[in-house]
UniProtKB/Swiss-Prot annotation:
Limits of the F-box domain: 56-103
SMART domains: FBOX (SM00256)
Domain of life: Eukaryota
Protein name: Putative F-box protein At1g20657
Length: 422
C-alpha cells in the first residue's frame, strides 16, 4: 500500500490510508480493479498472470467506488479504459455513467479555443483563470475541415457527420442545443427556397444510442434566421451564432416578414420543440459598423446581447452596451452602458476583437479575432471599471490565423450511434 501523497479527499470517498503518490499509479489501480470487478474473457494467459501478480500488491477498491473515481478522471483516461475490452467500453458508454461524468465536468468548466489552419481545425482547452497569470493551452483535437455539417467532440477527438437533410430546398441553417431535463442534445435545422420563407423545420436528437435521423416538426410562427453570405462549404453563415440557455435555444430571426432594422430573437424550447419570439429593444443594432460586432450571450443565466456603444453621428467607441432580457412575456429589456477606461478604450478601437461572452461573475470577455505575436483574453469588470488581460500560451504556431474562444466548456463522453447513410 502506498502511503501519503495525493489524497482523493475531494471525492469524499477515500480516507488517508488510500492516499496515492502518482496519477499513473491511480490509473493503473483503477484498471486492475475494473478488470477484477468485470469478467473479461479475452484477457487470458500471460495477461491474466501479469494482472494476478499486480493484484497481490494492491487492495481491492469496491466497483461502485471505481466507477465514481472514473467520473473524476480526464477524458483521455476514460478513452483508454474504454479500449480494455468490449464489456468495459459498454460500461463506460452507459448513459448513467456518461451523465454522471457530464454533471461533474459541468461543475469545473474550462476555456475552449479553436483555430483553423491549412484546411484543418485545431481545438485547445485551458483552465479558467483565477487572476491575470498566463494560462497554458493544451491541444485536444486536430481534424480536417470538410464541407458537410458535423458534430465534433473536442475532448475525445471524435466527430460525426450529420445525416443528409431530406429536402428539395436550397438553403439550410442549423443550430445546436441541449435539453437538461431529458439530458438530450438536439440539432434544429431550417430549410428554405432561395426567395422563400424558412418553411421546413427538422430536428435530430443526438446521444440517445439510436441511429441519427431527421424528423420534421411543426412551426406555427412564420420566420427565418438572420443569415448573410455563403461560406465556402455552400451553407449560409448566420449573422449571429445561436446560444442555448437552460434548455432554450435563442437565435436572431425575421418574424412575420419583418425586414426592418435589428431582427427579433426566436426562442426554441428544446424539450417541447415549440417556437416563440422576443421583440427587439429600441436601440439594438444589427451591425455596429466597427470592428466589434454585436453578439448574443448568456449573462448570469439570462439571454443578453453585447454591442459596441457608439456616439451619435460617430463611428468611434464610447463604450460597451449590454442588453439583458428581464421579462420574456412582456418583451422587457434592461440596458447598461459602460465607458471603458483609458488606455484600453484606444486599444480596443485599434484591434479587431470579438465578444466571447460574460463570465459567471459578470465580467465581459473579449478576444482578438486573429492570433498575432500573442493571444489573450480581456476581462472587463463593470463594477471596478477595470480590464484584466490574460495571456494564452501554446498557440504561437497559429500566428495570423483566426481564433475563436468559448467560455464554460464542459467535457462530455456521449457517443451517438452512427448513421447508415450520409
Amino acid at each position: 500500500m502506498v502511503k501519503t501523497g495525493y489524497v482523493w479527499s475531494s471525492l469524499g470517498l477515500l480516507n488517508n490510508e488510500y492516499a496515492l503518490t502518482d496519477a499513473d499509479i491511480v490509473h493503473r489501480k483503477i484498471e486492475l480493479d475494473l478488470l477484477k470487478c468485470i469478467d473479461f474473457p479475452e484477457f487470458t494467459g500471460s495477461v491474466v498472470k501479469a494482472l494476478k501478480r499486480e493484484e497481490k500488491n494492491s487492495e481491492t477498491i469496491p466497483f461502485d467506488l471505481v466507477i465514481e473515481i472514473l467520473t473524476r478522471l480526464p477524458v483521455k483516461s476514460i478513452a483508454r479504459f474504454r479500449c480494455l475490452s468490449k464489456l468495459c467500453a459498454s460500461t463506460l458508454n452507459n448513459s448513467d455513467f456518461t451523465e454522471s461524468f457530464f454533471t461533474i465536468s459541468s461543475s469545473r468548466p474550462k476555456l475552449l479555443f479553436t483555430c483553423p489552419k491549412d484546411g484543418e481545425t485545431f481545438f485547445f482547452s485551458s483552465p479558467k483563470p483565477r487572476d491575470s497569470s498566463p494560462l497554458a493551452s493544451y491541444e485536444n483535437l486536430k481534424g480536417r475541415t470538410i464541407s458537410k455539417p458535423l458534430i465534433c467532440n473536442p475532448s475525445t477527438g471524435e466527430s460525426w457527420p450529420l445525416p443528409r437533410v431530406k429536402t428539395n430546398r436550397t438553403i439550410i441553417t442549423s443550430y445546436f442545443g441541449y435539453d437538461p431535463i431529458n439530458k438530450e442534445f438536439k440539432v434544429l435545422c431550417m430549410t428554405k427556397s432561395k426567395f422563400g420563407v424558412f418553411g421546413e423545420h427538422q430536428v435530430l436528437t443526438f446521444g440517445t444510442g439510436k441511429e441519427l435521423s431527421w424528423r420534421k416538426i411543426k412551426c406555427d410562427m412564420a420566420h427565418y434566421p438572420d443569415v448573410v453570405d455563403y461560406e465556402a462549404s455552400g451553407y449560409p453563415r448566420p449573422l449571429y451564432d445561436g446560444i442555448c440557455i437552460n434548455g432554450v435555444l435563442y437565435y436572431l430571426g425575421r418574424v412575420h416578414d419583418d425586414l426592418d432594422g435589428f431582427p427579433d430573437i426566436v426562442c426554441f424550447d428544446i424539450k417541447f420543440e415549440k417556437f416563440s419570439y422576443i421583440k427587439k429593444a429600441n436601440g439594438m443594432k444589427r451591425n455596429s459598423g466597427v470592428n466589434l460586432q454585436p453578439t448574443l450571450v448568456n449573462h448570469k443565466g439570462k439571454i443578453a446581447k453585447l454591442q459596441a456603444n457608439i456616439g451619435p453621428g460617430s463611428i468611434r467607441y464610447t463604450g460597451i452596451q449590454l442588453w439583458v432580457l428581464e421579462d420574456a412575456e412582456k418583451h422587457q429589456w434592461s440596458s447598461y452602458i459602460y465607458v471603458l477606461p483609458p488606455p484600453w478604450k484606444n486599444i480596443i478601437e485599434e484591434t479587431k476583437l470579438r465578444f466571447v461572452g460574460t463570465s459567471d461573475t459578470g465580467d465581459i470577455v473579449l478576444s482578438p479575432c486573429n492570433i498575432s505575436n500573442s493571444f489573450y483574453l480581456l476581462y472587463y469588470n463593470p463594477e471596478r471599471n477595470a480590464i484584466t488581460r490574460v495571456e494564452i500560451q501554446g498557440v504561437e504556431a497559429f500566428k495570423s490565423h483566426k481564433s475563436y474562444a468559448f467560455l464554460d466548456y464542459a467535457e462530455n463522453i456521449v457517443k451517438p450511434k452512427p448513421t447508415r447513410k450520409l
